[in-house]
Amino acid sequence: MKTYPNVHVLDHPLIRHKVAIIRDKATTTKQFREVIEEIATLMAYEAFKDVPTKKIVVETPLESVEQTVVKENSIAIVPILRAGLGMVNGILTLFPAAKVGHIGMYRNEETLEPQEYYCKLPAHIDEKVVMLVDPMLATGGSACDAIIQLKKRGCKKIKFLAIIGAPEGVEKVAEKHPDVEIYVSTLDRCLNENGYILPGLGDAGDRIFGTK
């Protein structure tokens, strides 16, 4: 795959360890859900090294001191439904004051193209750093459509987080939206004829919610 300045593969031993757990078909729904949240927390930690901050004065038991804190109201989390919901709580662990929106999409199994069915976003989202999340970046169709919806609403700083990415999807999003920072935990081999990532982990939504 070509290299892109806006694509970041988070090569960290803790993330690799947890990705191995969610790949395993023997992993239970409960454990899968928990580990997805843990990976999301680790990814958000890396992706938000440039999080907006401000200076405040804190009173310690001994004296006053100037400290740097996060502007928590400057962040919005937007999961692509339904699998993206599995990553939200992990990110809220770091940013409990973040606003949460939702973009609902499903994949047409014949065309493999995304179909939007729901979009509800926080007020003034155009003033926030938006973290768009989906565990899988496969064809890139859903991610691109979701990014377009955010840009239509004036969003200027968007970060897209996916736990597992396929080269086809990563390239598509990177080329169509070079202004969006893309973070993946791991880059897999390819897509199969049905648009699933190989080796992947199966259907993330089904495994998070225990459905078939």
Whereabouts are the PLM-identified features?
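PRPP-associated nucleotide enzymes
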Residues: M1-K212
